[in-house]
Every structure is written in structure tokens, then in C-alpha cells.
Amino acid sequence: MTERSFDSFEVVENGLTEEQILQNPDCLISSHDENHPANVICKLCEQFFHNNWCTGTGGGISIKDPKTNYLYIAPSGVQKEKMKREDLFVLNETGDKCLRKPSMYKPSACTPLFLACYKLRNAGAIIHTHSQHAVMCSLIFKDVFRISNIEQIKAIPSGKIDPVTNKQIALSFFDTLEIPIIENMAHEDQLIDSFHDIFKRWPHTQAIIVRRHGIFVWGSDINKAKIYNEAIDYLMELAVKMYQIGIPPDCGIGEEKRYLEMPM
């Protein structure tokens, strides 16, 4: 490849041939558009590091480019607050061909899990964090995280479709948010069977908690995935605090008084 500054590469557009990509794979990650997947992943990884969700190289993000359907994936072993566009992997739409790989890093062990979310959940983006709130909830709850009657629940879709607008119906204040919990394994790619099982038994879930590990959250695009992740983390933190003062997170409205009146 000829010597050129990184920002001088042309932005990839629909219709770019594989030969062109092969000659200049960095065109897939070069863009001044703040909404380009390469830029969004780097920005969010830094933000999630400062949120204490992706420290010590933990966690990851993958985004499907809505223009090309190429899959952008954060690598393994990179400090998230220092991630650069050059660090990213780019796969084709089906995930069976690597179009661009960094020189220094290995593929994320989460890659098979991300691909399963794209294929079986029609996801547009997946966020994986090592949130302490997720880990704490995985220790408090047995198989399913539950929290009820909290305003922030309304940020999460119910899985139901409005017959008039044909849009997702959100959970209501009076609903219970449920997120399945699976057991952790030695390596993240070994979680794939558990993911497939959850996809069959929980067709409408937007997240999976991995015990003593963290959480995976997905959405139809990165904006929705980010909203769901933030809302769920808020609810998990609240659930832990409720548990600490003796209130079941899924208790009914007004029932908290009964638990607060009980001797500690």
C-alpha cells in the first residue's frame, strides 16, 4: 500500500467492489462522519470505559453498517478508552469473510455471539459490558432478573407490535422487565449454545445477563442498543439498592412499605 495519511482514504460507499476493498481495506474505516460505525464504536468504547462498564480491555461493541451491511467489531485486548478506528475488524454481511483486520489485535471472542444476534435477532448493533450492576444482579437473581413498576422500564420494548402503527410497543410502568441469566464459561465463544437456547425460549428479550461476567444488549441500531443498555444498567443498579434495603425489585406498588417496616 502506498504511503498515505489515514484520513486521506476515501469513505466506502454502496457498490464498492471486493477488489477495491482488498486493495485499500482502510477505506472501510475512514470517515469524518460521526455516525460512521468506526467512529461510533471508538466514541462509545471510551464513554463506556468512563462509565466503568468496559475497563481492563473488557467488553465490546459491534455495529452493522446500515449502508453496506458490513459488520464492524471491536477487537480483543484493546484498552477501550484508547481504541482507534485502525483497531477495528470489518466482516462481510454474513460474517464469514474478514474484509479488514488490524495488524496488532486478535478478533473478539464475542464474535460468534455477535453474529448470532445479527442472524437470529435481526440486530443492528450489540453492546457487551462488564457492568458491576449486571454481575451483582447475576448473584442476587437465580435464572431471571426481574424488576417491576419503575418508570425507566418504559425505555425497553415489550416485543409486541402495534397493529395500527406497526411499531414496537414499549413496556409500561406497570409491567415487569425480565432478562434471562446464563452461566459463564471459560471463554466467551463457549456461550453460543446458551445464547441459542435463550433465543428459542425468550423470543422478545433484548438482553442476556452472564453470571459473574456481564451483559449483552442489542437493538435494531446502535442508538436503540445504547438506550436499552443505559436503561437496563440503571434498573440493575436500582434493583441492587432495593435488595440491599430489603425490598424485592419486583414487588408491587405500595408493597415496599411492608418490607421497610420489617426489622432488618
Curated annotation (Swiss-Prot):
It catalyses: 5-(methylsulfanyl)-D-ribulose 1-phosphate = 5-methylsulfanyl-2,3-dioxopentyl phosphate + H2O. Binds 1 zinc ion per subunit. Keywords: Amino-acid biosynthesis, Cytoplasm, Lyase, Metal-binding, Methionine biosynthesis, Zinc. The keyword Lyase applies. The keyword Membrane does not apply. Pfam families: Aldolase_II (PF00596). It is found in: Cytoplasm. Belongs to the aldolase class II family. MtnB subfamily. This is Methylthioribulose-1-phosphate dehydratase. The lineage of its organism: Eukaryota, Fungi, Dikarya, Ascomycota, Saccharomycotina. The gene is MDE1.
